[in-house]
């Protein structure tokens, strides 16, 4: 059954009647290879992968029955390959958006999810950020140990929020599109929607909508705030920082201090703090 009557126009038709890809105990070699390729396709956002980039050791463990699909997904998400494609050159909030898409098959529901993962990464690091998705009850309930993650955001399931359907189309730009080949680049897609707790209208994939290339970057330019002014209705966050070392700052280690920023500038401010050599102690709602 089609996900919507407009499945062909929205680029979701390939998923409409697709069966879940699961690694069974009696799987043939061809079926195991299909699982491996499906994991690469989904977790790497349909981006091209060269033979030299494949995780040969993890693939071998999976073929020999010494690794579950879940652990293979973890290996891919923690690999240098994944970091090069989605972590090193992306805004941190964009990285979190993609983790939700790649590892849980949906878009973030609200900004509290983004803030939670920003804080988790700052305090516990990259591996803990990845583990938080794969070790979650949500992952276990939907994919278990041997089902390849898929796009749940196009379906209606218990526990899902309907706002996730619209937002999924800000992250998914068509079956043949990859997450590194989109016109908006490495910038976050959902910053404004999450900050205002609203969902935008659905825009068809880039190949099906001639006006797509002219879309304004509404998620990048603040609409309510100018300069240092914070609109009354904007949510703001408190970032506690310590240890800034940069020209213009005292050479003695600074004690902790806090700054207040609107949600839509959170990622930008975090990058600025890192460039100044600062360490983020916590991120909390102000």
Swiss-Prot record:
Biological process, per Gene Ontology:
photosynthesis
Q: Which SMART domains match?
A: CpcD
Predominant cellular place of this UniProt entry's protein: membrane
What membrane topology term does the record carry? Answer: Peripheral membrane protein
Gene Ontology cellular component terms for the protein in this record = phycobilisome; plasma membrane-derived thylakoid membrane
Gene3D superfamilies xref list: Phycobilisome linker domain
Domain PBS-linker, first and last residues per copy:
2-180
Which keywords accompany this UniProt record? Antenna complex, Membrane, Photosynthesis, Phycobilisome, Thylakoid
The record's section on Pfam families has: CpcD (PF01383), PBS_linker_poly (PF00427)
The subcellular location is: Cellular thylakoid membrane
Q: Record's PROSITE patterns?
A: CPCD_LIKE, PBS_LINKER
**Annotated ranges, domain CpcD-like:** 234-286
Q: Which family does it belong to?
A: Belongs to the phycobilisome linker protein family.
PANTHER family to which the protein is assigned, alphabetical: PHYCOBILIPROTEIN APCE (PTHR34011:SF6), PHYCOBILISOME 32.1 KDA LINKER POLYPEPTIDE, PHYCOCYANIN-ASSOCIATED, ROD 2-RELATED (PTHR34011)
Biological role: Rod linker protein, associated with phycocyanin. Linker polypeptides determine the state of aggregation and the location of the disk-shaped phycobiliprotein units within the phycobilisome and modulate their spectroscopic properties in order to mediate a directed and optimal energy transfer.
What is the name of this protein?
Answer: Phycobilisome 32.1 kDa linker polypeptide, phycocyanin-associated, rod
Taxonomic source organism? Mastigocladus laminosus (Fischerella sp.)
Give me the gene this protein comes from: cpcC
